[in-house]
Amino acid sequence: TGEKPFSCSTCGKCFLDRSHLTRHQRIHTREKPFSCSVCKKCFLDQSSLTRHQLIHTADKNFSCLECEKCFSKQSSLVSHQRTHTGEKPFSCSECDKCFAFSSELIVHQRTHTGEKPFSCSECEKCFSKQSSLTRHQMIH
């Protein structure tokens, strides 16, 4: 039916099931309880950690013809190749600015929406990018 009965008390976004809501809420709390035993990088959920761990264990059968960098997934190679080609397939519907990576578009769109999902635990100041919060936290 498309009903999404589980809603986030912080931002109001709704979800089909409780597990998706729980994962989403970690965005607001910055909780990343799943840690890579190799490099210590942390993740919101087990599936993201499992996917990440491939970079440490999987065969890297996909290599870039430009720089010979190797990847375990073809999608990672395709994404990397944009650094050489300059291709920017992700465009903003508000201003038509284009980006090479979907993550860059998501961050950019916050300039239009005003969304600031990263908040300082010391002073409550909010930021649109994690890197801006990290830089800010150095003043405390």
From Swiss-Prot:
PROSITE patterns: ZINC_FINGER_C2H2_1 (PS00028), ZINC_FINGER_C2H2_2 (PS50157). GO terms for cellular component: nucleus. Keywords: DNA-binding, Metal-binding, Nucleus, Repeat, Transcription, Transcription regulation, Zinc, Zinc-finger. It comes from the Eukaryota. GO terms for molecular function: DNA-binding transcription factor activity; DNA-binding transcription factor activity, RNA polymerase II-specific; RNA polymerase II cis-regulatory region sequence-specific DNA binding; zinc ion binding. InterPro entries: Znf_C2H2_sf (IPR036236), Znf_C2H2_type (IPR013087). SMART domains: ZnF_C2H2. SUPFAM superfamilies: beta-beta-alpha zinc fingers (SSF57667). Belongs to the krueppel C2H2-type zinc-finger protein family. May be involved in transcriptional regulation. This is Gastrula zinc finger protein XlCGF71.1.
